[in-house]
Amino acid sequence: MVRKMQMFADGRSRKVVFLAHCLLNQNAISDGTAEVPAAHREILRTVLDARVGVVQLPCPELCCLGLDRGDPKGGERPVVAENTRIRRAMGQPEASARLRELTDQVVWQIREYQKHGFAVLGIVGVDRSPCCGVNTTSDQDRELPGRGVFIASLRAALESAGLTVPVIGIKPSAPEALDRVRPLLGE
C-alpha cells in the first residue's frame, strides 16, 4: 500500500489574506496621495503577527494606466478630482480589457488556494480609491458610497465563480483601520 503525502504539510499556516497593492507599496500609488514612504507597516505587522500569508493584489491603476495614470500633472489636482479622472480612464476599452485580465488572475489564485485547502481569509481594499474602494470610491469629484471599478469587477467575478471571500475596505491611516482588519485574521 502506497501512502499519499499531503501537500503543503510543512511550516506554512495555510491561511492567506489578499491586500491592496498600495498597502504594501506606496510607490505605486497615484501622485500626491502617498501617506508613508514604503508600506503601511502596522497593517503588514498585524497580518504577519497573526501568522497569515500576504498576497499582494495587482495595482489596477498602475497595470492599466501606468505609474503616471496617463497624466503627469495628475498630482496637481485635488485627490478626488484626480481619482474621478482615473475612474473614467479605467472605463476606456483597453483599460477595461486589462482590468478583466487582472480580475481573472486574482480569481484564479483564490480558487487555487482554496482548492488546496488554504483558508482565504479575505480581501482588503482601500476606501476612496477609484479602483480598490470597497465602501467608498471617488466619482463626480468627491468621495461617494460605492465600490471602485476593480473591487466591483472582482466581487462580480467571485460571485460568478461561486467563491465566497469577505471583502473589507479601510483607510490605512485611520485609527480604526487595524480594528477592521483584525476580525478577518481571527483576532
PLM feature spans:
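Internal, conserved structured core segments that host functional sites
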Residues: A119-S138
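A structural signal for short, well-ordered beta-strand segments and their strand-loop junctions
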Residues: F18, V54-P58, G122-V126, P166-K171
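Short, surface-exposed acidic-centric catalytic microdomains
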Residues: P37-A89
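Divalent-metal-activated hydrolytic enzyme cores
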Residues: R3-M7, G11-S13, A38, V80-K115, ...
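Residues lining hydrophobic/aromatic ligand-binding pockets adjacent to catalytic sites
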Residues: V2-V16, N25-H40, L44, P58, ...
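Short catalytic/ligand-binding loop motif for oxyanion handling, primarily in non-cytosolic enzymes
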Residues: N27, C64-G66, C131-N135, E176-L178
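Short coil/turn segments at beta-strand junctions that form active-site/ligand-binding loops
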Residues: S13-K15, V52, F118-L121
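Active-site-proximal loop/turn and secondary-structure-junction residues that shape catalytic pockets
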Residues: L23, P60-C63, S129-C131, K171-A174
